[in-house]
């Protein structure tokens, strides 16, 4: 039976002594990570072509306080692994100068450390972290949903001033009954997605309210003196508002993707290059060297809408859930002209503009809703690709 990784996040309130120990662990994790970043930054093609990165033992020998730290040794090893992942991500994007590993800071909103050698038992209603760190009380409403025998790691995290215990399990996937539906999905800016059934789905209004709250908190932050106590408090309020937006969007996408997987055996969706679609509009200059209006403002608005919708994360959720539950998920090439083709007769309307939400086919005279027609074409092309690949 296939296995998947699932996590459960449990909020808890540590005692003053335990909170102090956890803060020491966060500090030890930051120190270990920053040692790797410092070594990475010391690279020099001539003077230091192969810098030696310190291991856990090296850091403990050189720093006596680290030997006495309550942080588990596996957490320090995981910190080094986290740095290597960040380093690999940087090298993948090196040509763009992005994702360079940066120093971890005590002022970062999220502090965490991960232990991959967990205890797999409970002491009553408490889960033991380690001998030095003590245990965490699990409230009845947060009871652990999966067997502890399948626990692979735990992470203690402090986010927006709240402590969380995040448990990661390897659990068997329960097979779902075969569904009969087939659906094509067209992603959009005006509507989050349009289905080939004609249904259009948008984020709930609550998301707009949360985004307004972010803007409100940011305006308050702009009026604070940088570095002051009020500035730090307001910065935490901004981070909390952002986290609410992120969690709401993630929850909505999980519920929607689960419903689509539950109802359909075959799902077709277009493949979009979000990074290319959200590039800045190039500036144009007139004869005097002054910038001319070329739709940059409209492009910025569209970029924000595209990034806000989170198309890539939604596609990833559909892909792995389809794999879990035996569904077929096919993505159509981004250059496929799904909006321009008539679903009924195949006529191609080459002059279709972005502002045209409906158009009449010159081949058969049918009135098309732009997005519904695109979703139908995506479903047809995905079925064709699936049959060709068999």
Please give the residue ranges for each predicted region.
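Gly/serine-rich nucleotide phosphate-binding loop at the start of the catalytic core
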Residues: 1-77
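Long, hydrophobic, amphipathic alpha-helical segments used as structural scaffolds
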Residues: 37, 41-44, 87, 91-98, ...
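Generic detection of short hydrophobic beta-strand segments and adjacent strand-loop junctions
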Residues: 8-12, 136-142, 146, 201-203
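Positively charged, helix-rich recognition surfaces that bind polyanionic ligands
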Residues: 6, 16, 20, 31, ...
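Acidic carboxylate diad motif detector
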Residues: 53-159, 298, 304, 308
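Stable alpha-helical structural segments in soluble proteins, enriched in small hydrophobic residues
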Residues: 36, 79-90, 372-382
């Amino acid at each position: 039976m296939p296995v998947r990784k699932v996590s459960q996040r449990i909020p808890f309130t540590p005692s003053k002594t335990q909170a102090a120990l956890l803060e020491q662990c966060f500090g030890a994790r930051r120190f270990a990570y920053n040692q790797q970043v410092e070594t990475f930054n010391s690279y020099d093609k001539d003077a230091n072509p192969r810098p030696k990165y310190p291991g856990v033992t090296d850091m403990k020998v050189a720093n006596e306080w680290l030997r006495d730290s309550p942080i588990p040794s596996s957490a320090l090893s995981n910190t080094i692994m986290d740095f290597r992942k960040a380093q690999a991500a940087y090298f993948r994007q090196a040509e763009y100068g992005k994702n360079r590993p940066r120093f971890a800071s005590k002022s970062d909103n999220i502090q965490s450390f991960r232990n991959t050698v967990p205890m797999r038992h409970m002491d009553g209603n408490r889960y033991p972290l380690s001998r030095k760190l003590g245990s965490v009380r699990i409230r009845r409403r947060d009871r652990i949903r999966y067997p502890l025998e399948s626990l692979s790691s735990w992470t203690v995290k402090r986010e927006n001033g709240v402590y969380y215990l995040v448990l990661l399990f390897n659990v068997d996937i329960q097979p779902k009954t075969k569904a009969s539906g087939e659906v094509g999905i067209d992603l959009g800016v005006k509507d989050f997605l349009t289905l080939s059934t004609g249904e259009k789905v948008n984020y709930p209004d609550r998301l707009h309210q949360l985004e307004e709250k972010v803007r409100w908190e940011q305006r308050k932050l702009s009026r604070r003196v940088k570095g002051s106590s009020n500035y730090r408090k307001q910065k935490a309020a901004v981070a909390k508002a952002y986290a609410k937006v992120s969690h709401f969007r993630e929850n909505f996408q999980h519920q929607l993707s689960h419903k689509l997987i539950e109802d359909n055996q075959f799902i077709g969706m277009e493949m979009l290059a979000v990074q290319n679609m959200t590039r800045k509009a190039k500036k144009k200059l007139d004869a005097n060297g002054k910038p001319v209006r070329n739709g940059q403002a409209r492009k910025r608005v569209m970029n924000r809408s595209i990034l806000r919708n989170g198309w890539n994360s939604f596609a990833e959720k559909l892909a792995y859930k389809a794999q879990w539950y035996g569904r077929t998920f096919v993505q159509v090439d981004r250059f496929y002209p799904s909006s321009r083709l008539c679903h009924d007769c195949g006529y191609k309307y080459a002059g279709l503009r972005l502002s045209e939400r409906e158009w009449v086919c010159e081949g058969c005279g049918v009135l098309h809703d732009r997005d519904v027609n695109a979703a139908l074409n995506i479903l047809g092309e995905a079925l064709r690709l699936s049959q060709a690949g068999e």
